From Swiss-Prot:
UniProt entry keywords in alphabetical sequence: Actin-binding, Cell projection, Cilium biogenesis/degradation, Golgi apparatus, Microtubule, Phosphoprotein
Biased composition (Low complexity): 522-532, 801-822, 965-974
Residue stretches making up the FH2 domain: 88-483
Biased composition (Pro residues): 33-48, 56-79
One GO biological process term: stress fiber assembly
Subunit structure: Interacts with CEP170.
Origin species: Mus musculus (Mouse)
Localization annotation: Golgi apparatus; Cell projection, Cilium
Ranges for region Disordered: 18-79, 464-540, 554-660, 681-1149
Comment block on domains: The FH2 and MBD domains are essential for its function in regulating Golgi ribbon formation.
Region (MTBD): 960-1086
Protein known as: FH2 domain-containing protein 1
GO terms of molecular function: actin binding; microtubule binding
GO annotation, cellular component aspect: cilium; cytoplasmic microtubule; Golgi apparatus; microtubule
């Protein structure tokens, strides 16, 4: 139970004396394991130790001693003093205060008189003593504690606690605690605080503090208890002491209340003065603000207007509460209501009215005030002061203390009362001013209405201002837009206002088609310019061709107007003249014989167009040979057709007014690419051209009186330049133009001479502007078909406006070939002009007269014709010269040409001129071969699709047959119906895919020299041309109506001239199909015919076997032409290998 005992037990456990513990539990004494501690000051006498046992203590029986255990020291003498000592309370106890050990003790009654561990330990405790000195050092407190402290702790302290408990009986413990906490904040003794209360010194305490003291005042019972306390006051607690002292002050409660009132009166009085002053000022503002009154009158007027005729109309006033309903009345204008309108009207009347709220400042301040609250505060202050004044009279001392304050308070309260009365009066006046009921309308409510009205009115003013600003900005933007629109409409921005197409359509709608010719004239190059769409479908090509045919017709009849007017159609070159068609020419000219027309115009063209210098440099023979064919292409150069779209008539077929358009200078200028000269075989070129002329010459054209000759006469405008230029002018200008126009026109096919010329000179010139070429793809088979003839017939008959350039080209090239076949020096005056006239006339007007070949060259579309011509020329050049040809605009490649007019097979077949049935070979194939140049153009339009290998064009029928599927009804397809079939040659509709700048192998000289001189371009005619060459000189009797036709000429040519040679020349069309076929047949043809076959287009190559036999008559001449033609075609081939290689390889295989 005692500390020492615990320590002893712990020591025993540490020493492992469990036996001793067990002995204590059983009441035995175990021998001490360690030497006994020093005995107390009066040590008891030591007992003898026996090694075998312990000295038993007398009272309890000792257990048997453990063997070997040390003897147990003798127990202390029995008695409480020993226990007292053990507990440390004896005189021998600690002299130093120790730290407390917080444990829970067992009550003494539970330990005494019972056998337990604690009683056992008490008996043996004298043997196990704690070292007091050590424990005091370790756990003793530094300060000395007197021995009396212990008894004080047990006695005196307990007595003090007992005294406190007695005071607590006076005050509740919790209350005493709260009071004590409150008193500690003053840092003063309770007596000092009570003294200040007694003297009325409130300066050191706040009103809140004094109010707290009032709350802590003792109750009556507590007062009684405190008064009944007679003990030492110093022994009372802080709270009890404070209350005991406080109750000793007389009227302590009244004094404290007086102190609180004195402390709060001034602040409360000042606040009341301020509030009353504010309310009075607000009342005056509402009554004196004229701007507010004006606004209210505006509201009254607006309300009367809106309510006119109703029960609420014609009002003389309105309740103030109605002001808040203004914003609820919405206007028709979004975001606007009646309040906005009133603000807007106030702004119109006077902008000062909008600022009325600035004069109601005190009204805004009244938001935190209330008249009722102010009156209540004033009344409370007055009651308190009066009560204090009455109560203070009982205590003279207190009365003296508060006298001054009370006097001051009474005065202030009287003043406040006066102000309150004035405020009330003014409030009533204000309510009456606004005609409100004093009973129901309170001053606070009135102020609140005007506060809200001011806020809403200011917001409405701001909204109006924002709206006006927004409208102003919007108007400004609109004005700017109007100015821009005006500037655009007035053309300030130049040509960007409207597109040329819009202007063109509008003008055409107003003026009709009379201005169409102007659209077809060259257009200045511009960023917006683009070549005609190369992906036109056949239908679109046909429509475009029809439209352009109309244009050509119009232009032929109408005087040349401003060339740039409505020039919306793209042109390959602004310098190219629009090709004229024979049927476009005035009928007076048409009535003239072909010779008559051709010669004068040819001379004119020769005069107009001086030969280029490079042409002059060329061998005369070479220049002369192409001269005849080139004049067709070259002289008709002013009338150069676009490969894609322009009619066959390349020569100046236009009426005399249009003749000025045929400028030789243009021809020279059109040469855009580098010109390559092939001086190797000028003679061969000459010969080839002569052969071609001869071949064409044998193909005798009917007299001008014939229907076919009439078309030639019509085409005479374009042909005469060619005729006259045939040798001289042709070689310079004609060659140039021809090289330019050869690709687009079938003229390239017309004669080997032309091909050679092109090979040498035009080879580089062969490059034709892509304007029309883009839309053209070589379609030899298609072009070779009796498209030229058929097309010509249909175009002439239908007036589609789709004059197949192929036909015209073919015709022109044939004419040139005829002229070339006559001696180079000579220009076949009647015959060549006749043939040329026939060709041109056939092209523009009597395309049937061109014969089936001419029809074949006449492609369904101008694009086709143009492409065909350009391709054959390219073929010839490539053969003749390895150098890559420079592509230039051909006469058939007028800038104006955009689309090919697809001519229905029936229409082409139904050409007015029927040629005698060609030999089955030549008929289908030959006609295409003669038409190859135009057809190749068509193939250039369709050629891509037609690139599939076709039978050799040498035999017109053979080569034609593949085309016949396309141009069913072509002349070759219908040998019996030569004339109609010839028109069908133009069956071949240009492939939608145009080939651009694809060098075409020049048709072999055989083709060129094919008697289809009227349509040298058509590959079909070319194969027959070799045969016809001989026949043309010995033409079998042919009906007059068919003599001028290409069919008749091709027949005769077929009979005589070796078709292979001519096919090669005519194959100049080099449609992709022909090129493919060329792989096989052209090789054979080239072997037989030499360069002429090489020049022939792929179809011509196909036809080569057939035409080779037919062309045996003219082998020599054709061979000569072949040399040149092959060189040129070789050039074209080389240049076109890249593009045509892909097409030719499969076909050749």
């Amino acid at each position: 139970m005692h500390v020492m005992n615990c320590v002893s037990l712990a020591s025993d456990k540490e020493n492992g004396t469990l036996a001793t513990a067990a002995a204590f539990m059983t009441g035995q004494t175990s021998p001490s394991a360690s030497p006994p501690p020093p005995p107390p000051p009066p040590p008891p006498p030591p007992c003898p130790h026996s090694g075998e046992g312990f000295s038993p203590s007398p009272p309890p029986p000792l257990p048997p001693p453990l063997p070997g255990g040390p003897p147990i020291p003798p127990p202390p003498p029995p008695g409480l003093p020993s226990v007292s000592y053990l507990n440390g309370y004896s005189s021998l106890g600690k002299k130093k205060r120790m730290r407390s050990f917080f444990w829970k003790t067992i009550p003494e009654e539970q330990v005494r008189g019972k056998t337990n561990i604690w009683t056992l330990a008490a008996k043996q405790q004298h043997q196990y003593q704690i070292d007091k000195k050590t424990i005091e050092e370790l756990f003793g407190q530094q300060e000395d504690t007197s021995k009396a402290s212990l008894p004080k702790r047990g006695g005196a302290l307990n007595s003090s606690f007992r005294d406190a408990r007695e005071e607590v009986t006076v005050l509740d413990a919790k209350r005493s605690m709260n009071i004590g906490i409150f008193l500690k904040q003053f840092k003063k003794s309770p007596q000092s605080i009570v003294e200040d209360i007694y003297q009325g010194k409130s300066e050191h305490y706040g009103s809140e503090t004094l109010r707290e003291i009032l709350k802590l005042l003792p109750e009556s019972e507590e007062v009684k208890k405190l008064k009944a306390f007679n003990g030492d006051v110093s022994k009372l607690s802080l709270a009890d002491s404070f209350l005991h002292c406080l109750i000793q002050v007389p009227n302590y409660s009244l004094r404290i209340e007086a102190m609180v009132l004195k402390k709060e009166f001034l602040p409360s009085c000042s606040s009341l003065f301020k509030d009353i002053r504010t309310l009075r000022a607000a009342t005056k503002e509402l009554m004196l603000c004229e701007e507010l009154h004006s606004i209210l009158h505006l509201v009254l007027q607006a309300g009367n207007i809106m309510n006119a005729g109703g029960y609420a109309g014609n009002a003389v006033g309105f309740k103030l509460s109605s002001l808040l309903k203004l914003a609820d009345t919405k206007a028709n204008k979004p975001g606007m209501n009646l309040l906005h309108f009133v603000a807007q009207e106030a702004q119109k009347q006077d902008a000062i009215l909008l600022n009325f709220s600035e004069k109601l400042q005190h009204v805004q301040e009244t938001s935190r005030l209330s008249l009722d609250i102010t009156e209540a505060e004033l009344h409370s202050l007055f009651v308190r002061t009066k009560s204090l004044q009455e109560n203070i009279q009982l205590d003279q001392e207190l009365c003296q203390q508060m006298e001054d304050f009370l006097q001051f308070a009474v005065e202030k309260l009287a003043e406040l009362e006066l102000w309150k009365r004035e405020l009330q009066g003014e409030a009533h006046t204000l309510i009456d001013f606004f005609c409100e009921d004093k009973e129901t309308m309170k001053l606070d409510e009135c102020f609140q209405i005007f506060r809200d009205f001011c806020t809403r009115f200011n917001k409405a003013v701001k909204d109006n201002h924002d709206r006006e600003e927004q409208e102003r900005k919007q108007l400004q933007r609109q004005k700017e837009m109007e100015q821009k629109r005006y500037s655009w409409s007035t053309g300030e921005l130049g040509s960007f206002g409207r597109s040329s197409s819009e202007n063109d359509v509008q003008m055409l709608a107003k003026t009709g088609t009379e201005d169409l010719p102007s659209f077809l004239k060259p257009r200045p190059n511009s960023p917006s310019y683009r070549p005609p769409n190369t992906r036109r479908s056949r239908l679109s090509l046909g429509i475009s061709a029809d439209r352009e045919l109309l244009t050509f017709l119009e232009s032929a009849t109408s005087s040349p107007e401003d060339p740039n007017k409505f020039n919306s159609l793209p042109r390959s070159s602004p310098r190219q003249a629009r090709p004229t068609i024979a049927w476009m020419e005035p009928r007076e000219q048409q009535s003239h014989g072909p010779n008559f027309t051709h010669e004068p115009q040819a001379s004119k063209i020769q005069e107009k167009a001086p030969p280029p210098a490079w042409q002059n440099q060329l061998p005369t023979t070479w220049r002369e040979e192409p001269a005849s064919p080139l004049p067709l292409a070259g002289r008709s150069r002013p009338s150069l057709r676009k490969r894609n779209s322009e009619p066959v008539g390349l020569g100046p077929t236009q009426s005399p007014p249009l003749l000025p358009l045929d400028l030789g200078v243009r021809e020279h200028e059109l040469v855009t690419g580098l010109t390559q000269f092939d001086l190797q075989s000028p003679k061969s070129l000459e010969e080839g051209s002569q052969l071609t002329l001869n071949d064409f010459c044998p193909t005798k054209l009917p007299s001008p009186g014939d229907r076919s000759s009439q078309p030639f006469a019509a085409g005479g405008d374009s042909l005469p330049p060619k005729d006259t230029d045939t040798q001289e002018v042709l070689s310079p200008a004609g060659e140039d133009d021809r090289t330019i126009s050869d690709e687009p026109s079938s003229e390239a096919l017309v004669s080997v001479v032309v091909t050679d010329t092109e090979d040498k000179d035009a080879g580089p010139l062969l490059y034709v502007s892509d304007t029309t070429d883009c839309s053209l793809t070589l379609d030899c088979s298609e072009g070779m078909d009796s498209r030229a003839g058929g097309d010509k017939q249909e175009e002439e008959k239908e007036g589609d406006g789709s004059v197949s350039s192929g036909a015209g080209e073919a015709g022109s090239s044939q004419v040139s070939s005829n002229s070339v076949s006559s001696p180079p020096g000579e220009v076949p005056a009647p015959k060549s002009s006749k043939s040329e006239l026939s060709c041109q006339g056939g092209l523009p007007k009597d395309r049937p007269s061109r014969g089936k070949d001419a029809i074949a060259p006449k492609r369904n579309s101008f694009k086709e014709a143009s492409v065909g011509a350009s391709k054959p020329v390219s073929a010839r050049r490539s053969q003749g010269v390895t150098t890559k040809p420079v592509r230039t605009l051909n006469s058939s490649e007028n800038e104006h040409m955009r689309k090919v007019v697809p001519i229905s097979k029936s229409s082409r077949g139904a050409g007015p001129w029927k040629r005698p049935e060609p030999t089955p070979k030549a008929t289908p194939r030959e006609t295409p071969s003669s038409t190859d140049t135009p057809l190749s153009r068509r193939s250039s339009v369709r050629g891509t699709s037609d690139t599939s290998p076709r039978r050799p064009q040498v035999s017109g029928s053979g080569a034609e047959e593949p085309r016949l599927p396309r141009s069913s009804g072509s002349i070759s397809g219908r040998p019996g119906k030569d004339a109609p079939l010839q028109p069908r040659a133009s069956f071949r509709k240009p492939s939608a895919k145009p080939l651009r700048n694809i060098p075409r192998q020049k048709p072999e000289e055989n083709k060129v020299s094919s008697p289809n001189s009227p349509d040298p371009e058509s590959p079909k005619e070319e194969p027959k041309a070799p045969q016809a060459t001989g026949v043309s000189r010995a033409l079998p009797p042919i009906p007059s109506f068919a003599r001028n036709t290409v069919a008749s000429s091709s027949r005769s040519l077929r009979t005589d001239a070796p078709p292979a040679a001519r096919t090669t020349g005519l194959t100049r069309t080099v449609s992709q199909r022909q090129l493919r076929v060329k792989g096989g047949s052209e090789d054979s043809a080239s072997k037989d015919i030499g360069t002429l076959k090489r020049a022939s287009s792929a179809r011509a190559s196909k036809k080569c076997p057939e035409s080779a036999g037919g062309s045996s008559a003219n082998v020599e001449t054709s061979l000569k032409g072949r040399g040149t033609t092959e060189r040129s075609s070789l050039r074209l081939k080389d240049s076109g290998q890249a593009t045509l290689g892909r097409i030719l390889r499969p076909l050749q295989k």
